[in-house]
Design a protein with these regions (language model features):
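Amphipathic alpha-helical assembly/interaction segments
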Residues: 1-147
Length: 147
């Protein structure tokens, strides 16, 4: 399993899965934007652990999040989700790179800052929607139990 401390910030996995599962049905575009902005705080290792588990066809995934250890039993057909998980992971990495490279607002003019912020929020909304789709399908097929 990948290093848990790499990301440095953790999120409660059960809460993430439940929240994103509901998001597809309940949230407006504006709410999805807010959710997208929270992705910066999400744990990269969680997505990595899921992706690796699906590739290896493991039946369990164990990792830490929110200061707790989780042991997740995967059910059903796992192969279906591999591409979606990889896409989510790639989107997250692209988002992080975008944040670090393009969101240095201190030296920008107000106009440029507004334009960058608008682009950033559109990107967040797209990624938030994508994450909701794959996590919703995973949530229906996993049993989450705290150790």
């Amino acid at each position: 399993m990948s290093s848990i401390s790499k990301a440095g910030i953790f999120i409660d996995v059960k809460q993430l899965l439940e929240f994103t599962y509901r998001m597809n049905k309940e949230m407006s575009i504006a709410d999805r934007r807010d959710f997208g902005s929270q992705l910066i705080r999400y744990n990269l290792d969680m997505i990595t652990a899921f992706t690796m588990a699906f590739h290896r066809r493991d039946e369990r995934v164990a990792f830490e999040a929110g200061g707790k250890s989780y042991d997740i039993q995967l059910k059903g057909e796992k192969r279906f989700h591999v591409d979606a998980l990889e896409a989510a992971f790639d989107s997250y990495q692209a988002l992080m790179e975008f944040c670090f490279e393009n969101l240095t607002f201190s030296r920008m003019s107000a106009r440029k800052r507004r334009r960058r912020h608008k682009h950033f929020m559109e990107l967040m909304a797209k990624i938030g929607t994508g994450i909701a789709k794959w996590s919703g399908s995973i949530y229906k097929q996993v049993v989450v139990s705290e150790k």
